[in-house]
Amino acid sequence: MASRMGMVAILSLFVCALVASTSVNANVWQTDEDAFYSTNKLGVNGNMEMAQQQGGFIGHRPRLASFNRASKQLDREKRPVPSGPDPIHHSIPSHAPQHPPSYGKAPYEDDKSIASPGLSNLIGPPPFLDRY
């Protein structure tokens, strides 16, 4: 049974490797010119010089994370952050006030609203009864 499972695992890895080597996305592993240029005529936008300046790779490039955005600020101060909801993503009418409404007291600040007094007596260990 173990040898059969091992053979299935090896066969499945072989099939996955075969599919990956023949797929279009496997061009990363190839180093010949055919992997970088499908034709030797023109680049993506019809500009061969642009394709050569970019290192010759035509196709999907992964986006790299940029961590230097904050260091490029000239004034070295905090960036201004708008307050309130974004009117583009939230349907707020233009005549609505731009500040949040103020409430007198939140309902959870009252002790009676946390748990009703009838249930507070039931919480805890059961009372000791004389059974003997």
Swiss-Prot record:
Signal peptide residue numbers: 1-26
Location of the region described as Disordered in the Swiss-Prot/TrEMBL record: 68-132
Keywords linked to the UniProt accession: Developmental protein, Differentiation, Glycoprotein, Hydroxylation, Secreted, Signal
Gene Ontology CC annotation, any one: apoplast
Glycosylation site residues: 85
GO biological process: cell-cell signaling involved in cell fate commitment
InterPro entries assigned: CLV3/ESR
GO MF term list: receptor serine/threonine kinase binding
Keyword Transferase: no
Residues bearing the modification Hydroxyproline: 82, 85
Keyword Secreted: yes
Highest taxon in the source lineage: Eukaryota
Family as reported in the entry's similarity comment: Belongs to the CLV3/ESR signal peptide family.
UniProt cross-references to PANTHER family, sorted A to Z: PROTEIN CLAVATA 3
Identification of the protein by name: CLAVATA3/ESR (CLE)-related protein 2-B
Organism of derivation: Zea mays (Maize)
